[in-house]
């Protein structure tokens, strides 16, 4: 109602949106994206509950070649996007499992946890820990009964902050997750938005005897959110459980979309795509971050993803900033929406500790709009500062 156009359409500034560019990243040698997919008479049959064999093989080949893993197609379940896979994992957790989730995470996790009646504890995210708590905080058993299992839910690279666990830190996280009584759901939607690309599968020792769940998708790094293809990598036993659910609760995933995903994952193509995504978004992260620092914003962004995690000066708040941006066809994501400790009923009396924080997305922004995006943001921000008596 404020601007008259849907966010993301021409003339708007989709700084609140979580989608990537869906055109080739030509500046960095990104490959073309497929513009068609062949559909045969066989594709009009019902799809298999666990995913098309060709796509499962393509996913396996990608992870095994990139990360030195040894998964098989029986470790892969295909879903209609990333979030149905995450929802399914949560829906089938046993009653003695408690989730640990960061105070700041992807907003949809709270919906999923609530709708599946999952018990969860919050792990603090603060300026003091740089919005990057230690691995051990997710597995702290103080006050946890002996028969309770712990399952951290972590996006990595993290949405909204871009904080990333890689190398030895990620190895330690997976080692903890594989211990008896533990598990993990690692959401790797932004796997390619880090140098180098990062996946927990690199450090998994015994997937089939673990409760490690890795979520991936074509949505971000493969630049194709509209085809709605995602997957879960897990033990054969856990995949079998999810496939049983698919047969009665989902009915499989569109064959044409799965064929498109196979084309995206063609080995020589995906190698070029991964390199281009890394370079393009590293470049965007760096120059937007520098511009925000020059404005005097607090920048707490990690080295992954395509968001900036920013703090306004004292005396300002992100909700008021957003209202002012709306008038110009722009928006940010207020941090309160990422606050996993807020009541899901959206109790108006709840005061988030993150009122000055917000997420700025450079994911869908074209390189040539950098100057105009920063100019508009600076104008609205500076006007708000003046009105707040801060200048």
Q: What are the roles of these predicted feature ranges?
A:
Residues 234, 309-316, 332-381:
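Conserved PLP-binding active-site segment of the aspartate aminotransferase-like
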Residues 39-180, 191-207, 213, 375, ...:
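Conserved core of the PLP fold type I
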Residues 1-50, 65, 147, 182, ...:
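N-terminal "arm"/small-domain region of PLP-dependent enzymes with the aminotransferase-like
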Residues 22-23, 281-282, 296-329, 337:
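Conserved PLP-binding catalytic core of the aspartate aminotransferase-like
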Residues 14, 105, 262, 278-289, ...:
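Conserved glycine-rich beta-strand-loop-beta hairpin in the small C-terminal domain of fold type I
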Residues 18-22, 83-84, 105-107, 128, ...:
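Short, solvent-exposed loop/turn segments at secondary-structure junctions
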